[in-house]
Amino acid sequence: MFLGQYFEIFDWFIIYFTENNGMAFGLELGGELGKLILTLTRIFIVVFAIRYLFKLNLSKYKRPVLVCFGLILGGAIGNIVDCLLYGVLFNDSYNNIASLFPEEGGYSSMFFGKVVDMFYFPFFSTEIPSWVPYFGGNNFTFFKPVFNFADSCISVGAISLILFFRRDLNSVSYTHLRAHETSNH
């Protein structure tokens, strides 16, 4: 597919090929330094989270909680892999279809690749009434962001942890903290 090309599965489900240089909703830190900082920060957070999970006694967590952690970490690692490798392995998608292992090399170096997003769910569109300050008269589409499977994993895992397992996390974390404090004295 060409960058920006799309096809409809249903009116409310579109496969839309785009590349995201930043993070959620296309937010960027700006420039090459910003991209490098973003990629290194993602790697640091994932490594820290994995190390923290290994320090915990995971047997105290229910299996669904561990699945949520797995979704979050798996999604984060998937997006990191895109940032690290996509630009090295593929050529530019502007005005042509990206090819794997192009003779001239990829469009960027390690750490500077873009994340591929493709899922678009414009469930409904409406015009905001003109009397609404600032936004009045503008078109509003719900749900406008284009995202990928890794983003979905992160979102589902995080929302599930917050909605369904908040008490479990608080009690196990508190128990872990108390055990750690006791062992240090």
Predicted segments with their positions:
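Alpha-helical transmembrane bundles and membrane-interface segments of multipass inner-membrane proteins
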Residues: M1-R178
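A short, hydrophobic C-terminal helix/tail in secreted or cell-surface proteins
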Residues: A179-H185
